[in-house]
UniProtKB/Swiss-Prot annotation:
Organism (species): Penicillium simplicissimum
Gene3D superfamilies assigned: Aldolase class I, Golgi alpha-mannosidase II
Entry's Gene Ontology BP terms: carbohydrate metabolic process
Glycosylated position list: 81, 158, 176, 232, 378
Coiled-coil segments on the chain, per record: none
Source species taxonomy: Eukaryota, Fungi, Dikarya, Ascomycota, Pezizomycotina
Catalyzed reaction equations: Hydrolysis of terminal, non-reducing alpha-D-galactose residues in alpha-D-galactosides, including galactose oligosaccharides, galactomannans and galactolipids
Entry's localization field: Secreted
Family: Belongs to the glycosyl hydrolase 27 family.
S-S pairs: 41-73, 123-153
Gene Ontology cellular-component annotations: extracellular region
Name recorded for this polypeptide: Probable alpha-galactosidase B
Transmembrane segments: none
Molecular-function GO term, any one: alpha-galactosidase activity
Claim: Secreted is one of the keywords in the record: yes
């Protein structure tokens, strides 16, 4: 039986100083595409340029999607340039080098990202950046890179942490968001900025800040070393969990975990629940909608992870939902939506199978309040949004409402709105002026 997590304890969690960059880079959640979920190691310039061209052709660029990110396996394996010590792009995959692809991406009015790791090798065994931070940052800047995803693989034993941190992820069998079986836990009150993980990630931050080119820094340390407490002074997004996979159980686990990280969301800083799986695996249409909607209202980075040249109209429509993107990219209100009621569980319950089901958040771009209702159950069920329960809507009994999926004006809705939802589906409402 799951118990409840204390709201008081959450309120006492510290906030971090934000890493403010030039030209607003990193102020809002990043929007873009990444090669890994679609292609893994099978990446090359053709696939990157196909994605870039499709982002323009499909109208994604017009909605704010701008980063085209190369993930792991882009370089020659097992060696660096003996003269410059730089990582060597694989010319079989990238005949014009990374800079050549960057030029083509920039010509489309888009930005380009690259991948490395805070270890000696990447997750796929390619050269990584630990000990070469300045060399690699200089190369990335020279090549025209705009975004760095920095992973946590290949860490040698002398760079591992003294203590283990609690990441209440799926495989850890978390008890109410804690890790009772954790080996070698840190003592209470331990300052994780003293950890080797913090040092490894700040070394690359400082190397990037030393370049004249502004490169968005996306930390991928899988939630380790209590990164939520220092991620925002180090980068503009930070992974708060282990990797995602294209199945509902994993998506629900990460959504549940990230629910308890919303106090860390704000301008310049965004907990990252990993790249999108919309269009991948055996996700149902309902699950694709719920996945994207939850990531968007949490003000997470929205990094597409599917092959865009074969995407279905239905999945493309999900990724292009203007209401959710406008909420995610609000230039005036930095906070995310928050759960106002858990629904399936008592409030503040940590349940990897049943995340909080009722969410709301104010939006300057939508000129109203976004309301989300999730059916986390395995069968069709009704969810009801009661206006007086929603913090932003307690002043009146009736409001004008728009269905964010269909765009339909639902008219003046009195007291509450009910929706019959298929398993793992969501209703998303834009609630505007009183009527």
């Amino acid at each position: 039986m799951l118990t409840s997590l204390s709201l008081t304890a959450l309120a006492l969690l510290p906030s971090a100083n934000a890493l403010v960059r030039k030209d607003g880079v990193g102020r809002l959640p990043a929007l873009g595409w990444n090669s890994w979920n679609a292609f893994g190691c099978d990446v090359d310039s053709t696939k990157i340029m196909t994605a870039a061209n499709e982002m323009v052709h499909l109208g994604l660029k017009d909605l704010g999607y701008e980063y085209v990110n190369i993930d792991d396996c882009w370089s020659v394996k097992n060696t660096r340039n003996s003269t410059t010590q730089r990582i060597i792009p694989d010319t079989q995959k990238f005949p014009d080098g990374i800079s050549g692809v960057a030029d083509q991406v920039h010509q489309l009015g888009l930005k380009i990202g690259i991948y490395s790791s805070a270890g000696e090798t990447t997750c796929a065994g390619y050269p990584a950046s630990l000990g070469y931070e300045k060399v690699d940052a200089e190369a990335f800047a020279e090549w025209g890179i705009d975004y760095l995803k920095y992973d946590n693989c290949g860490v040698p034993s002398n760079w591992t942490d003294q203590y283990s941190s609690c990441v209440p992820d799926g495989s850890n069998e978390p008890a109410n968001g804690t890790c009772p079986g954790l080996s070698n836990p840190a003592p209470a009150g331990y300052d994780w900025t003293k950890s080797n993980t913090f040092t490894r990630y700040t070394m690359m931050r400082d190397a990037l800040l030393g370049q004249t080119r502004t490169i968005l820094y996306s930390l991928c340390d899988w939630g380790q070393a209590d990164v939520n407490t220092w991620g925002n002074e180090t980068g503009n997004s930070w992974r708060m969990s282990g990797d995602i996979s294209a199945n509902w159980a994993r998506i629900a686990q990460i959504a549940n975990e990230n629910t308890f990280r919303m106090n860390y969301v704000g301008f310049w800083g965004h907990p990252d629940p990993d790249m999108l799986e919309v269009g991948n695996g055996d996700l149902t249409a309902a699950e694709n909608r719920a996945h994207f909607a939850l990531w968007a209202i949490m003000k997470s980075p929205l990094i597409i992870g599917t092959a865009l040249d074969g995407i279905s109209d239905a999945n493309l429509a999900v990724l292009k939902n203007k209401y959710l993107i406008e909420f995610n990219q609000d230039p005036i209100i930095g906070r995310s939506a928050h759960p106002y009621k858990w629904g399936y569980n008592p409030d503040w319950t940590f349940d990897p199978a049943h995340p909080a089901e009722y969410w709301s958040g104010p939006s300057s771009t939508l000129k109203g309040t976004l309301v989300l209702m999730l059916n986390s159950e395995n069968s069709t069920s009704t969810r009801t949004a009661v206006w007086k329960e929603i913090p932003e809507l307690k002043g009146h009994n009736a409001y004008r409402v728009t269905d964010a999926w269909s765009g339909k004006d639902l008219g003046c809705v009195k007291k509450q709105y009910s929706a019959s939802l298929a398993s793992h589906d969501v209703a998303v409402l834009v609630v505007k002026e009183a009527c």
